[in-house]
Swiss-Prot record:
This is NAD(P)H-quinone oxidoreductase subunit 1, chloroplastic. GO terms for molecular function: NADH dehydrogenase activity; oxidoreductase activity, acting on NAD(P)H, quinone or similar compound as acceptor; quinone binding. It catalyses: a plastoquinone + NADH + (n+1) H(+)(in) = a plastoquinol + NAD(+) + n H(+)(out); a plastoquinone + NADPH + (n+1) H(+)(in) = a plastoquinol + NADP(+) + n H(+)(out). NDH shuttles electrons from NAD(P)H:plastoquinone, via FMN and iron-sulfur (Fe-S) centers, to quinones in the photosynthetic chain and possibly in a chloroplast respiratory chain. The immediate electron acceptor for the enzyme in this species is believed to be plastoquinone. Couples the redox reaction to proton translocation, and thus conserves the redox energy in a proton gradient. The chain crosses the membrane at residues 29-49, 103-123, 128-148, 164-184, 202-222, 247-267, 303-323, 342-362. It is found in: Plastid, Chloroplast thylakoid membrane.
Length: 362
């Protein structure tokens, strides 16, 4: 059968179209891969920083043998967990046991979609950005509860119940604080919230307009991260390791990863909501406005924004690590009383006060 020239050109055009689709697909996932690489590096840095700061507080020597200054210690630990045997409980629910860590990790990773790390550097600038984060972060305790229930272990089950109770108790004050910030910024978009703080530089940050909300958000974030003094779901002296008791290998490593990812997400949201995000501390005259805008200047401005955002986030990280080695663990009744009887009324009063001021200013 003879194929004429028109049919050959048509076939070639379709093949080129398929090639373009493949190239476009690769380009579209490039930002996601870049973000995942950045998150991985950040987690490794946070683990190293925590060990070094903890060693300094306790006046001892931190990791020093795995690489220069112990920088490769986290990679060595992750590699060890990757190759350890994955032990499954004989009388547990194997499917839920395997799904639990995955739900926890995925829910935390999705939170990075709406975090603006720099100017024009956000995966999804949604109109409901902060509410999407709250909705996604409330899924993680379901994974922890599934992990505790499926282990068929009383310590694991108690740890899962504690994680769920703790998350519910502190999610509500956290939401009220976010609502107050949204009222001040007239938007739920994380990018709009940052830009609303850029007008007056350092004095335009929401931490000065919402000092009570900032303290409540700070405490609630630490509780959501299950850090000392709020690490009751995995209290070693009481519950062995809580919902992680029956886990080993890569599944245990996923829970370890979730802990530091939660800490990183909370640090970035404190920066975005209260510390001006990528904005510099001087009043709003951008250094880059003196130059003609081109690609090089745009990339440099974005890089500076990322650097400023991460610098502010590391301040929260330092505070959380210091608190870990300063305050003792709370009892479960004290933790619930703090959430329901103290933080909830204060955050609700702060929201009502903010609403009143916004109505008066109209």
């Amino acid at each position: 059968m003879i194929i004429d020239r028109v049919e050959v050109e048509t076939i070639n055009s379709f093949s080129k179209l398929e090639l373009l689709k493949e190239v476009y697909g690769l380009i579209s996932i490039l930002p996601i891969l870049t973000l995942l690489l950045g998150i991985t590096i950040e987690v490794l840095v946070i683990v190293w920083l925590e060990r070094e700061i903890s060693a300094s507080i306790q006046q001892r020597i931190g990791p020093e043998y795995a690489g220069p200054l112990g920088l490769l210690q986290a990679i060595a630990d992750g590699t060890k967990l990757l190759f350890k045997e994955d032990i499954l409980p004989s009388r547990g629910d194997i499917s839920l046991f395997s799904i639990g860590p995955s739900i926890a990790v995925i829910s935390v990773l999705l939170s990075f979609l709406v975090i603006p790390l720099g100017y024009h550097f956000v995966l999804a600038d949604l109109s409901i950005g902060v509410f999407l984060w709250i909705a996604i972060s409330s899924i993680a305790p379901i994974g922890l509860l599934m992990a505790g229930y499926s282990s068929n272990n009383k310590y694991s089950f108690l740890g899962g119940l504690r994680a769920a109770a703790q998350s519910i108790s502190y999610e509500i004050p956290l939401t009220f604080c976010v609502l107050a910030i949204s009222l001040l910024s007239n938007s739920l978009s994380t990018v709009d919230i940052v830009e609303a703080q850029s007008k007056y530089g350092f004095f335009g940050w929401n931490i000065w307009r919402q000092p009570i909300g900032f303290l409540v958000f700070l405490i609630s974030s630490l509780a959501e991260c299950e850090r000392l003094p709020f690490d009751l779901p995995e209290a070693e002296e009481e519950l062995v390791a809580g919902y992680q008791t029956e886990y080993s290998g890569i599944k245990y490593g996923l829970f370890y990863l979730v802990s530091y990812l939660n800490l990183l997400v909370s640090s970035l949201f404190v920066t975005v909501l209260y510390l001006g995000g990528w904005n510099f501390s001087i009043p709003y005259i951008s250094f880059f406005d003196f130059f003609q805008m081109n690609k090089a200047v745009g990339i440099l401005e974005m890089t500076m924004g990322i650097f400023i955002t991460l610098t502010k986030a590391y301040l929260f990280l330092f505070i959380s690590i210091t608190i870990r080695w300063t305050l003792p663990r709370m009892r479960m009744d004290q933790l619930l009383n703090l959430g329901w009887k103290f933080l909830l009324p204060i955050s609700l009063g702060n929201l009502l006060l903010t609403t009143s001021f916004q109505l008066v200013s109209l």
